[in-house]
Amino acid sequence: MSEAEARPTNFIRQIIDEDLASGKHTTICTRFPPEPNGYLHIGHAKSICLNFGIAQDYHGQCNLRFDDTNPVKEDLEFVESIKNDVQWLGFHWSGDVRYSSDYFDQLYNYAVELINKGLAYVDELSPEQIREYRGTLTAPGKNSPFRDRSVEENLALFEKMRAGGFEEGKACLRAKIDMASPFIVMRDPVLYRIKFAEHHQTGNKWCIYPMYDFTHCISDALEGITHSLCTLEFQDNRRLYDWVLDNITIPVHPRQYEFSRLNLEYTVMSKRKLNLLVTDKHVEGWDDPRMPTISGLRRRGYTAASIREFCKRIGVTKQDNTVEMAALEACIREDLNENAPRAMAVIDPVKLVIENYPQGHSEMVSMPNHPNKPEMGNRDVPFSGEIWIDRADFREEANKQYKRLVLGKEVRLRNAYVIKAERVEKDDAGEITTIYCTYDAETLSKDPADGRKVKGVIHWVSAAHALPVEIRLYDRLFSVPNPGAAEDFLTTINKDSLVIKQGYAEPGLKNAEAGKAWQFEREGYFCLDSRHANGDKLVFNRTVGLRDTWAKIGE
């Protein structure tokens, strides 16, 4: 397969192919421009894969530029987390990290140019009045009484804004376009506003800050971006993007193209809502494994490769749609099924005693680290006469469909012996505390000599060698597919989104690395929690189950 055939195809790549074929561009330059006011989420991953992927495939460049024009909401913590997320996903930006604040001097000069052309003015309406004057989708706006100030007056007032001569909210710079435009974004949008706040890059040099729509297009042009890729909600903003560049003296005029944003079931993507989940302590933090943030997915055990594959599968279109959670889970399940070594852990343990096993004896049984990959080798796991099994793997009575341990019947212990349940011991509440069994000593990893069939296989952990572990069973954070549509999305939080169990694992997991994935046999895929990797007790997070459970949930 050729390189071109192996590439994904979509309408944006078709545009790029045409631009290269026509000679409009000889090299491709894209950018990823996050605002450093929160952690990146799975929706940003789609944009990262698109922009950096295009740069890779077309041997161009992709800039990482922080849209840092609102110092009140931004923080260096978010800057660092975003850089880490981009690199963890497997991408590298071209040259140094860029900031919109790098261009504050040029942006100011371009604003002065618009004033000199009679295309911008200082407005002293209050923010509430500006909203009122802007009109609605069905009613045109009306001109500000300050709209027709002279160029000289506007220059003086804009300089006064810069010098700190106005209080916040008392003045702003607006573009002079058309208050009757059918597009509200073109009704004299604000270009600069006053904020007396220290900026994480420029300190206290500025007290006026440019708005996104003014900053974005000029930053693209200054960096020589050829294709400025945004999500669909910025479609109308393209008119302002072009208006600004058409009316200033700048040699490069990038083009903006819009694609559909990623919507995922059973979660929210709004930074405001995600922030509320964190500040109100509905979750542990931005990296809570139930969060759709890249750091949350990473802590849960998602791999960068699985997220890239997910973004590849959902594709790039102009149609908004909501992706089922099963699609994301399928990507990580396939990845881990292929690559995760196997281990045994008992999540809901009950003691099982093999009464005819030599007392005080133990032995090592060999187990493959991966059933389909002999190159991953084997491991030795201790076995003894007292083991832990999962409570769900035993019943006193059961029908023929139940292929686990039943009183009076046999089952195989994974890679060990065939055992038969003889009797049980219960506490005062009727709860089984111990299962007593016998074993067939001639069945270590082989069938019974007399030819009898033993159909079920269950996993186990030797009690004498067991490693106590905390197991966190994560589920969807919300109980409805579209929590954002609820009047109060917090009322739809799934109270069972985290269930904590105290279990036992085979001793080899004592040296598990944080973030490394394991398949706990018959249970699912788990990883050691990075926040608790050095604690007294090992904490494992369930990344995903062995099978797709979403089809049942949706029925």
Swiss-Prot record:
Localization annotation: Cytoplasm
A cellular component annotation (GO) from this entry: cytosol
Sorted UniProt keywords: Aminoacyl-tRNA synthetase, ATP-binding, Cytoplasm, Ligase, Nucleotide-binding, Protein biosynthesis
Catalytic activity, reaction form: tRNA(Gln) + L-glutamine + ATP = L-glutaminyl-tRNA(Gln) + AMP + diphosphate
Chain ranges for the short sequence motif 'HIGH' region as given in the UniProt record: 34-44
GO biological process: glutaminyl-tRNA aminoacylation; glutamyl-tRNA aminoacylation
Binding site for ATP: 35-37, 41-47, 231, 261-262, 269-271
Chain residues that bind L-glutamine: 67, 212
Enzyme Commission no: 6.1.1.18
Domain of life assignment: Bacteria
Short sequence motif named 'KMSKS' region, residue ranges: 268-272
GO molecular function: ATP binding; glutamine-tRNA ligase activity
PROSITE patterns: AA_TRNA_LIGASE_I
PANTHER family (UniProt xref): GLUTAMATE--TRNA LIGASE, GLUTAMINE-TRNA LIGASE
Oligomer status and interactors: Monomer.
Membership in a protein family: Belongs to the class-I aminoacyl-tRNA synthetase family.
Protein name, per record: Glutamine--tRNA ligase
Species annotation: Cronobacter sakazakii (strain ATCC BAA-894)
